[in-house]
Regions:
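Conserved catalytic core of the tyrosine transesterase superfamily
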Residues: 1-207
Length: 207
């Protein structure tokens, strides 16, 4: 059954008329073994985490933009690292970002006006002299510019987790970028989005 579902969604990705069939197949239930429910971030903790980076410092603006994209787009940290200026389509009627996922598959993710504001502010500071193929988030070591590492993204996330922890002791002990993705997926499901559509954001989450 899992193979049939995967095939139908593969076809539906290229043919929108097949999506209703794929969604119907996804509702066929089958017996599962017991799975451990993975941690997510509670709404009040999440709000504090996203608000933690300062809007008055260069680094704070960068860090807030990273956290917002990880959550709002529900993207993997590897996909965040692949983003370039050319990935961003901020001036379209409906702004969106081209995200390169696993298997070099590209998908289009629409973004809110508020996220556009954060991105434009970040770009004005960090990309005043770069061209379109530069990494959106980068580090410069000995004059060499390269995409920010996964380790750096994790350190940024946990830096702000520790900052708010005294007032938010319920935060998981250690946060990972994928936890923001999982939290976003769970939030969508709780707001009425079809489970199969949510699970295509995060196949490994248990909702």
């Amino acid at each position: 059954m899992a193979a049939i579902r995967s095939y139908l969604w593969y076809v539906a990705d290229g043919e929108i008329s097949m999506q209703s069939i794929a969604l119907g197949a996804s509702k066929v239930t089958f017996i599962k073994g017991t799975q451990k429910v993975k941690e997510t971030i509670k709404p009040d903790d999440l709000a504090a985490l996203l608000a933690a980076p300062s809007d008055r410092s260069k680094i704070g603006i960068r860090d807030k933009t990273i956290l917002i994209l990880l959550y709002d787009l529900a993207i993997r940290v590897s996909e965040l690292r692949e983003l370039t200026l050319e990935s961003l389509k901020l001036n379209e009627t409906i702004p969106y970002i081209r995200v390169h996922g696993k298997g070099d598959k590209e998908r289009i993710v629409s973004i809110t006006d508020k996220t556009v504001e954060h991105l434009k502010r970040y770009i004005k500071i960090y990309h005043s002299e770069t061209n379109g193929d530069y990494p959106l988030f980068y580090t410069v070591i000995k004059g060499n510019l390269s995409a920010m590492s996964t380790g750096n993204v994790e350190r940024i996330l946990n830096k702000y987790a520790e900052k708010i922890r005294p007032d938010h002791p319920g935060l998981p002990q250690k946060l990972y970028p994928h936890m923001l993705r999982r939290t976003r997926a769970c939030g969508l499901y709780q707001n009425g989005v079809e489970l199969e559509l949510v699970s295509r954001i995060d196949r490994k989450s248990v909702v």
